[in-house]
C-alpha cells in the first residue's frame, strides 16, 4: 500500500493538499453559529442521496406519479424512511439556510472583500427555495397540483412577457404532463447541478478569503 501511496504522492502531492486543508487558521471568535452553512451543505448531500434513491421508483407522469409515491411509502424496502428523511432534511435545509443568511448579515460577513461570496450565497438561497417549489409538485396530489398552478400563474401579471413566461414554465397553456416533466427535470438535474457549481464557488471564496472577523 505504501508503494501505491508513494506513486500517487509523487504525482499529485496529496500530503501538501491535506496539510493545506487541515492547517487553515480558524479565528477565535468562531462559534456554533458559524456551522450553519456546513449543516446546510450536509442537508443538501442527504437530499442528493435520498432523492437519487427515490428515482428508482418514482414515475414522473400525471397518471403514475401519485401511485409511485404511494409505492415508495408502503411497499419499497425502507422507502418510507428514505422519503421521510428526504422531507425532513428538506425542511432542515431551508431552516438552516435562513439562519445562515441571518448570521452572515448580522455579523457583517457580506462586506468588502466578501461581496461575491454574499452574491453566490443569495443565489444558493434562491436555488434552495426553487427546490422546495419543484419538489412540492412531484407527488402530483391535489396540494402539489394547485401549488404548481398558483406558482406558475404568478408571472401572468407581468406586462407583455407574462403570458409567454407562464407557458414556458408550464410547457403548455395549462398545467399538465409537460409541467410535471419540467419540474421533475429542474428538481433532479438542473437545480442540483447549479447548486453544486455555486456551492463550489461559494466555498472556494470562503477558503481563499477566510472567515470574516468579529464586528
Curated annotation (Swiss-Prot):
<dbReference type="InterPro" id="IPR005797">
    <property type="entry name" value="Cyt_b/b6_N"/>
</dbReference>
<feature type="binding site" description="axial binding residue">
    <location>
        <position position="86"/>
    </location>
    <ligand>
        <name>heme b 2</name>
    </ligand>
</feature>
<keyword id="KW-0602">Photosynthesis</keyword>
<feature type="transmembrane region" description="Helical">
    <location>
        <begin position="116"/>
        <end position="136"/>
    </location>
</feature>
<dbReference type="GO" id="GO:0046872">
    <property type="term" value="F:metal ion binding"/>
</dbReference>
<dbReference type="GO" id="GO:0045158">
    <property type="term" value="F:electron transporter, transferring electrons within cytochrome b6/f complex of photosystem II activity"/>
</dbReference>
<keyword id="KW-0812">Transmembrane</keyword>
<protein>
    <recommendedName>
        <fullName>Cytochrome b6</fullName>
    </recommendedName>
</protein>
<comment type="similarity">
    <text>Belongs to the cytochrome b family. PetB subfamily.</text>
</comment>
<keyword id="KW-0813">Transport</keyword>
<keyword id="KW-0793">Thylakoid</keyword>
<dbReference type="GO" id="GO:0016491">
    <property type="term" value="F:oxidoreductase activity"/>
</dbReference>
<keyword id="KW-0472">Membrane</keyword>
<keyword id="KW-0408">Iron</keyword>
<keyword id="KW-0349">Heme</keyword>
<dbReference type="Pfam" id="PF00033">
    <property type="entry name" value="Cytochrome_B"/>
</dbReference>
<feature type="binding site" description="axial binding residue">
    <location>
        <position position="100"/>
    </location>
    <ligand>
        <name>heme b 1</name>
    </ligand>
</feature>
<keyword id="KW-0934">Plastid</keyword>
<dbReference type="GO" id="GO:0022904">
    <property type="term" value="P:respiratory electron transport chain"/>
</dbReference>
<feature type="binding site" description="axial binding residue">
    <location>
        <position position="187"/>
    </location>
    <ligand>
        <name>heme b 2</name>
    </ligand>
</feature>
<feature type="binding site" description="axial binding residue">
    <location>
        <position position="202"/>
    </location>
    <ligand>
        <name>heme b 1</name>
    </ligand>
</feature>
<dbReference type="InterPro" id="IPR048259">
    <property type="entry name" value="Cytochrome_b_N_euk/bac"/>
</dbReference>
<comment type="subunit">
    <text>The 4 large subunits of the cytochrome b6-f complex are cytochrome b6, subunit IV (17 kDa polypeptide, PetD), cytochrome f and the Rieske protein, while the 4 small subunits are PetG, PetL, PetM and PetN. The complex functions as a dimer.</text>
</comment>
<feature type="binding site" description="covalent">
    <location>
        <position position="35"/>
    </location>
    <ligand>
        <name>heme c</name>
    </ligand>
</feature>
<keyword id="KW-1133">Transmembrane helix</keyword>
<feature type="transmembrane region" description="Helical">
    <location>
        <begin position="186"/>
        <end position="206"/>
    </location>
</feature>
<dbReference type="InterPro" id="IPR023530">
    <property type="entry name" value="Cyt_B6_PetB"/>
</dbReference>
<keyword id="KW-0249">Electron transport</keyword>
<dbReference type="InterPro" id="IPR016174">
    <property type="entry name" value="Di-haem_cyt_TM"/>
</dbReference>
<comment type="function">
    <text>Component of the cytochrome b6-f complex, which mediates electron transfer between photosystem II (PSII) and photosystem I (PSI), cyclic electron flow around PSI, and state transitions.</text>
</comment>
<keyword id="KW-0150">Chloroplast</keyword>
<keyword id="KW-0479">Metal-binding</keyword>
<dbReference type="InterPro" id="IPR027387">
    <property type="entry name" value="Cytb/b6-like_sf"/>
</dbReference>
<dbReference type="GO" id="GO:0015979">
    <property type="term" value="P:photosynthesis"/>
</dbReference>
<feature type="transmembrane region" description="Helical">
    <location>
        <begin position="32"/>
        <end position="52"/>
    </location>
</feature>
<feature type="transmembrane region" description="Helical">
    <location>
        <begin position="90"/>
        <end position="110"/>
    </location>
</feature>
<dbReference type="GO" id="GO:0009535">
    <property type="term" value="C:chloroplast thylakoid membrane"/>
</dbReference>
Amino acid at each position: 500500500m505504501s508503494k501505491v501511496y508513494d506513486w500517487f504522492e509523487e504525482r499529485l502531492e496529496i500530503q501538501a493538499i491535506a496539510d493545506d486543508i487541515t492547517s487553515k487558521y480558524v479565528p477565535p471568535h468562531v462559534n456554533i453559529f458559524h456551522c450553519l452553512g456546513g449543516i446546510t451543505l450536509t442537508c443538501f448531500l442527504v437530499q442528493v442521496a435520498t432523492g437519487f434513491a427515490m428515482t428508482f421508483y418514482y414515475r414522473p407522469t400525471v397518471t403514475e406519479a401519485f401511485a409511485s409515491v404511494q409505492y415508495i411509502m408502503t411497499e419499497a424496502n425502507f422507502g418510507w424512511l428514505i422519503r421521510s428523511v428526504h422531507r425532513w432534511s428538506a425542511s432542515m435545509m431551508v431552516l438552516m439556510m435562513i439562519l445562515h443568511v441571518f448570521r452572515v448579515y448580522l455579523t457583517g460577513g457580506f462586506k468588502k472583500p466578501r461581496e461575491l461570496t454574499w452574491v453566490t450565497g443569495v443565489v444558493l438561497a434562491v436555488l434552495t427555495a426553487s427546490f422546495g417549489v419543484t419538489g412540492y409538485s412531484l407527488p402530483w396530489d391535489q396540494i402539489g397540483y394547485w401549488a404548481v398552478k398558483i406558482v406558475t400563474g404568478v408571472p401572468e401579471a407581468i406586462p407583455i412577457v407574462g403570458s409567454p413566461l407562464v407557458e414556458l414554465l408550464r410547457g403548455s397553456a395549462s398545467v399538465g404532463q409537460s409541467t410535471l416533466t419540467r419540474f421533475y427535470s429542474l428538481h433532479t438535474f438542473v437545480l442540483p447541478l447549479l447548486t453544486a457549481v455555486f456551492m463550489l464557488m461559494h466555498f472556494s471564496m470562503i477558503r481563499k478569503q477566510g472567515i470574516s472577523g468579529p464586528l
